[in-house]
Each structure stands twice: as C-alpha cells, then as structure tokens.
Amino acid sequence: MQDIQLDTLLSEDVTPENASQVMQALSQSLNEHNIRYYVDDAPSITDSEYDRLMQRLLKLEALYPHLIVADSPTQRVGGLALAKFDQITHLKPMLSLDNAFDEADFSAFHKRVTDKVGEVSFCCEPKLDGLAVSILYRHGVLERAATRGDGSVGEDITENVKTIKSIPLKLRGNDFPELVEVRGEAFMPKAAFEALNDRARAKDEKLFVNPRNAAAGSLRQLDSKITAARSLAFYAYALGVVEPDSHPLAKTHFEQLQQLKSWGLPISSEIKVCAELSQVYDYYKNILTRRSDLAFEIDGVVMKVNDIAQQQRLGFVAKSPRWAIAYKFPAQEEMTLLEGVDFQVGRTGAVTPVARLKPVFVGGVTVSNATLHNADEIARLGIKVGDTVIIRRAGDVIPQIVAIVPERRPETATDIVFPHNCPVCGSLVERLEGEAVARCSGGLFCEAQRKEAIKHFASRKALDIDGMGDKVVEQLIDKELVQSPADLFKLTASMMTMLDRMGMKSATNLAAAIEAAKTTTLARFLYALGIREVGEATAANLAAHFASLDALRVATVEQLTEVEDVGAVVAQHVAHFFAQPHNLEVIDALIAAGVHWPAIEAPSADAQPLKGQTWVLTGTLNQLNRNDAKAQLQALGAKVAGSVSKNTDCLVAGEAAGSKLAKAQELGVKVMDEDELLALLAANA
C-alpha cells in the first residue's frame, strides 16, 4: 500500500487544476514520514525515497509558489534574514524550577509535597541542557514559537524553530485542541556539536564552548538558514495553554506527554513514572551513571508530581511550581591555583571577595574567577593566596571553591585580609552583628553602588526607562551628569549628546523615555529603590498592603510582618531602609522631580463582600472577558484560583464548561452562570 502511494505521489501528472491537491498530498506525506522518523523511530521509507518526494514538492512549489502551504516541509530551510527579534508575551508565564543538589534537598521537597497532598508518584525525565521554548499550534498548524525570556516575555523565534526537523509543522491526527501550547527544550545533540566545531576548526573560526551555548546561539540567529544548518533537536516536556479549556486531556503528566507524542511531537525515551521514593533515587543514579553515554548533554533530572489534580492543589510560588524540582547532578570539579583576591562592591554595598584563579577548564567552560562570598567562608575554607584549590561549577553554572589541598600549600602562601575601607570610595567597611556580609557605608556616595543602583532603578522591571542601558548609565556617572536617581530627571537631550554614540535624535528619544518614566506605580517605585531582598512580588505586596508611600515610610517591623510573604528579616531591611535620612532625601528628590503614581484606594470591608472566598472561572464568557471578570472579583475581595477543590466557594461556568464544572458538581461547590455573575458585580458596583 505504501509503495503504491509513493509511486502515485512521484508519478502523477500535475496540471494547474490538480496542483494544489498533489502538493498538499506531498506535504502531508513528508510530514508524516518526518514524525515516523524523528518521533516514532520507525521510518517506513528509505532516505532516498524521502529525498525524491522532497525534490518533487520543491519543483512543484517553484512552478506554483502561490500554492505553498504553511505546513510544507520545504519551509524548514530558512527564509529571509530578520532585522531583529520581535517580543512575544507568553499566554501564561514560563516558570523556572527550584533545584535540589543532594538527597537532603530532594527529601525536603518530597516532604513539602506529601504534607500538602499525601502520597504521590513522580514523572521523572532527564534535565536537558538547552533552551526552553514555547510552541503554539492553532488548528494543528505551527503558528509561533518563542524563547522563555524573562518568563513573561520572550523572543519570537518562529522561523528558526521551523527549521528543527523533529518539530512537526502540522500536528498528527485530529484530536488536538483548537489551540495548544507545547513547551519543551531545544538542544544540540553531542554529535551535532562536535560536527559544528569540526567545521569551525577547519575554517579557523571561534569554537563553541558547549552544546548549550551552541543551541542558544543557533536559535537566536537572525538568519534562519544558519539555524537550519545547525542540526538542532527538540523534546517536548509539558503542555502549556490549551483552548478551549474544556478539551479532554489526560489526568497525569506522563499520559499528557503520550498525548503530545501521539500528535507527532518528540519526547524523551528516558521518561519514567516512579511510585516509590526509592525508585526516584534509583532513576537519578541510573541516569547519572549513563550521563556520558546519552546522545545529548544533561545536568540533572526533573521530578514532577505525576497527578495533574495534585499539581493544581500544590500550585506555584512566584517563579516556580511547587510540584516539580530539578535534581541536579554533582558539579564537575578541577584543581587550580589561587593567584590573588580582589574585592568587589555591589549595588547594595556588599563587599565580596573574588578569587583570581589560574584559568582551568571545568564543567564545559574556562573558569578564572570564583566568589569567596564573605569573611566567614574564607575562614571556613582556611584558604590563603597561593593555595591549590578545588573549583566546582555549582549547578553547572556558578564557579565555586569548595576546598583547598593542604598538602600543596607553599611556604609563601599569604593570608587574605578583608579591607577596612571600601576599595571604590574609601568609606569604612562595616559588618553588622549577625550578618555574614560586610558592606560599604558610603551608600549612594559610593560610585560602585551608585552605578548599580541607577542601573537597577532604570531597569525594565523597575521604572523601565527605555534606552537607559548599562553603558549609558556608566557614561552618565563617569561624566558626572548623574550622581543619584533623581538626577536622571534633570537630564536634557542636549546634555546627553555628550555621551559616546548619542546623537540628538537618540538623546531626544531618551529624554522622552525619562519623562514618560515619571508616571509609574507604587509597586514599581518600591522595587526600583533597591531595598535589600525586596523583589517584584514583595514590592507589589507592600504597595497593596499600605496603599501609600507615607504609610510605608513610618511602618514598624511588626506592621511590616503583617504583609503577605514578608518575614522578620525582610521587614527589618525595609524598616532600616526608611530609617536612613539619606534614603529619604533621595525619595523626596525623586518626588520633587515629578515621579508619581496613581493613588491606591484601600477597599473598605463593606466593599469586599467576597473577602476570604475562593472563586474559579471556566468556559467562555460572552459579555465579560475573563481578565475583567477576574479583576472585578478580586476587587470584591475574592481569590481567583485556576482549579476547583474542596476549598472553592463558587465556580462561574460560562459556555462549554468542561471538567471544572463536573468536579464542582461532584464536590457540591456552588455554581453560577455569567448572568448571575453580572448581577452580582452590578449589585456591588
């Protein structure tokens, strides 16, 4: 049957009337053979037969270019080069994973999980050392692909992803959702990496350090033809957004991966479900033992709670799911010489000793520096300049000195002496009782702190001054145009033309961006101040709780600990920050310069009749979009969750409500339709 079909595709006469039909049949056949080869590992035609089909399709597309379809396999070869990558906002955030570095870490994770949901099984898979990618299919056709980026916004790499032969341009079958997001890892197999470096070596070009860097660099090529020549691969590891959300999906992570495979997406053959903790450890040890024999680089294994309902009950923290963890392999280690120690001053004034090492190749990169953290760490290691040290790449990323080799210590070895004065500004270095970190007391007077503080202040997640990059900030400070954050708002376009490579047009645009940044939010402003351990989420919680800067400025430690996710340590940092006169002077100067934000109205108890309740939205709402409905419910005090549980107070069911409605009815949860929701919102408007 297959031979007859193949012969027909290769021999059928083509006319303008039947060209579209023949070309679609060729595309469909080639796509199916790609899946059989890359996903099923069961090719049904020879390479030469595949090439003949491809050549026939290419010839027909040359004759009838207006009939080329989006899922044609010829579209993998790469098109015109791009000028830049567009930004894509993910439909839902692409979170990272927490790490476990030993059995104690994993055991603690396991206890947190089982304390919350009881006994669990884990879906275990190798942690590929590549680049996280989101791929969106609409009606089964690949529509767009993006990098993870910062988790919320990534780069559009659609044309490059289309060149990866193992990724289907059109999904197999017809049981997939109308819209489905597939998340996975793009990587470069070891053999492809070696071949790439062999070609570079032959041309006397720069070599790639490791497959991960090669994969990342290949995916971020503006010319997709370069990507097409790099032999990248892809494994799917999760479903993302699915629409409609009523579409039936498997109830376990492992079964959902099998669904992805049935649609033609490649998944790792090393995936395994482990019901017992001992099986998880055995799986980890087995993969670790075979690490060097695998066709691709890995840096650990990922353990995910297999049951989707349990995943939903566990939920997420700010940047990672509570139901998954990356169990990292022991880092690779090498010995080298400690040649000296430099002291660096960070944005918060932390004075950090940095070891200067005789360069050594470890964990795939050449390491010449490593942090020594603080004086306590130096004392713990008993380390001296001139020692032979053991260097490790912790988590295969951050170089770390883990020990010295005492028997190799020379007589000329010298003690490491912490400076009494800041190496940048000369201010006294202080170490507060109970803190391991020594800090420069110079505050924003210290140039090192000033640069980093203003870089942070202008960054995208802070005041988001478009065009105010690190190099611009450094020049502004070096040329003494800016000494504090408030000075940014005194800059004029003509002043900024003094900067290197800053013409009047660029300076005018930057001046406009600075003016626009005056209008912000209280949460962004608090984050921009660079208060120790106050990240985006904490800044947002502080803003929501106190509603005004004046209230926050006078808050006590006790009042601060009442804020969600603010513990005693963070509360002390916040209180200490607002107790410093110099910090208050900077804040007052910023407000005087015109920085402002809309007032946050603290809701009264009467205005929040749903306070303490948990609501869930499902199905299609016709008169109100879901984001608006969620925002209005939250304004009434409700917590809006993504899944139904026994703790759910009410489910709002729109059209085509599916499994969430069934579960709510099973649990006896109150169900409300859209009209009832609108009536509730109107009554509380």
Swiss-Prot record:
The keyword NAD applies. NAD(+) binds at D47, S48, E49, Y50, D51, S96, L97, E125, R148, E185, K304, K328. Keywords: DNA damage, DNA repair, DNA replication, Ligase, Magnesium, Manganese, Metal-binding, NAD, Zinc. Zn(2+) binds at C422, C425, C440, C446. Its EC number is 6.5.1.2. GO terms for molecular function: DNA binding; DNA ligase (NAD+) activity; metal ion binding. HAMAP family: DNA_ligase_A. DNA ligase that catalyzes the formation of phosphodiester linkages between 5'-phosphoryl and 3'-hydroxyl groups in double-stranded DNA using NAD as a coenzyme and as the energy source for the reaction. It is essential for DNA replication and repair of damaged DNA. PANTHER family: CHROMOSOME TRANSMISSION FIDELITY FACTOR 18, DNA LIGASE. This is DNA ligase. The gene is ligA.
